Structures are given as structure tokens and as C-alpha cells.
């Protein structure tokens, strides 16, 4: 079970809303979100309702302003609790439709470019666990939640291009 608290103002001030499960529309509970406290679980937050727009991955911890979760603005309109698994495995491909296997990963990868001499991933297959793909190295830039399934092209995970900088397993560290 997870627990996350959204605050309208920075520094955990202002009106707040506590959530313990997926919520496709947070708009009735607050008008803006400038700080967040994650008490338990791993969460993916979305800029727009119904799990649309920019995505932000948060683990247990305090986020006193939206820049702490690499937010582009103070808009959080939906969230989902990500189930934690003990094993993680995914395959990266350099071409669409899972052609041109690059590698199979079971650990975090802070820099795809350094490890595989590649800055784009055109398709992938998540075999086990949930992952977050970041468009830039060292877990920066736009984020995309990857659940176990086949992603035949980068648009399938919500990206506008094939840019891939780093990958992180979804693991609740506490």
C-alpha cells in the first residue's frame, strides 16, 4: 500500500490532499501542486488527468518544490501507485518492432550512450518489473513509465522521439 500527500504551496504548506491508490483525476482536490511527501510506495505522477502529459517518478521522500521532482510546472492532475517486484528485466532494440537487439538489462543504467554507444531506442520489451526511461543520462529529462509488455515503437511509451538517456528499475528502497 502506498501513501502520498500533495500540497498546493511549497514547503508542505497550504491545502493538502492525501492519496493511497491510483487517481485518474486530482483536479477536484487541489488547483496546483508545489510540494509532495511520499510516505510509502513508488508513484508516477502525470501533468494532466487520465494519466496523460509529462510523467514524474517519485520514491519515498520529501519534495519541497516541483523542481525537486524535475517538474516543468505546478500541474499534477493524476497519479498511479506502481507495484514493486523483486525481479526486473527488459530488452532494448535499435529498430522498431523489436529488431536489432542491443541488450537485455536487469539493473539500472545511468547512461545508455556510454554503455551501448547509442542515444536512441526505437523499441523495447519489458519482461519483468516496472522501469522508468529518462530521455537524458543520469535520470534527467522527460520520464516514461514502462510496464511489462512489448513496445514496438517509441510512441507506444508516450515519447515524441526515440531519445533515450538512462533507465531505472522501479524499486521501493525502504
From Swiss-Prot:
Annotated GO biological process: lens development in camera-type eye; visual perception
Domain Beta/gamma crystallin 'Greek key': from-to ranges: 2-40, 41-83, 88-128, 129-171
A GO molecular function assigned to this protein is: structural constituent of eye lens
Positions carrying S-methylcysteine are 23
Coiled coil regions in record: none
Q: Where is this region: Connecting peptide?
A: 84-87
| Key words, A-Z | Eye lens protein, Methylation, Repeat
Report which superkingdom the organism of origin falls in.
Eukaryota
Which InterPro entries does this UniProt record tie to the protein? Beta/Gamma-Crystallin, Beta/gamma_crystallin, G_crystallin-like
A GO CC term assigned to this protein in UniProt? cytoplasm
Q: Among its keywords, does the record have Repeat?
A: yes
PROSITE patterns membership: CRYSTALLIN_BETA_GAMMA (PS50915)
Q: What is known of its domains?
A: Has a two-domain beta-structure, folded into four very similar Greek key motifs.
Checking PANTHER family in the record gives: BETA/GAMMA CRYSTALLIN, GAMMA-CRYSTALLIN C
Q: Which family does it belong to?
A: Belongs to the beta/gamma-crystallin family.
Q: What does this protein do?
A: Crystallins are the dominant structural components of the vertebrate eye lens.
The name of this protein is Gamma-crystallin C
User: Source species, please?
Assistant: Bos taurus
Amino acid at each position: 500500500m502506498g501513501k502520498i500527500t500533495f500540497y498546493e504551496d511549497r514547503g508542505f504548506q497550504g491545502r493538502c490532499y492525501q492519496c493511497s491508490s491510483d487517481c485518474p483525476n486530482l483536479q477536484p482536490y487541489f488547483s496546483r501542486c508545489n510540494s509532495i511527501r511520499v510516505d510509502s510506495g513508488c508513484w508516477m505522477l502525470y501533468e494532466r488527468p487520465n494519466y496523460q502529459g509529462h510523467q514524474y517518478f517519485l520514491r519515498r521522500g520529501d519534495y519541497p518544490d516541483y523542481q525537486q521532482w524535475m517538474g516543468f510546472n505546478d500541474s499534477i492532475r493524476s497519479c498511479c501507485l506502481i507495484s514493486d517486484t523483486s525481479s526486473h528485466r527488459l530488452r532494448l532494440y535499435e529498430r522498431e518492432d523489436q529488431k536489432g537487439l542491443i541488450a537485455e538489462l536487469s539493473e539500472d543504467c545511468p547512461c545508455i550512450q556510454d554503455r551501448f554507444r547509442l542515444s536512441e531506442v526505437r523499441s523495447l520489451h519489458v519482461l519483468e518489473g516496472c522501469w522508468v526511461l529518462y530521455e537524458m543520462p543520469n535520470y534527467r529529462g522527460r520520464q516514461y513509465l514502462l510496464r511489462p509488455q512489448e513496445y514496438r515503437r517509441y510512441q507506444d511509451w508516450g515519447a515524441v522521439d526515440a531519445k533515450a538517456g538512462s533507465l531505472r528499475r522501479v524499486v521501493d528502497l525502504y
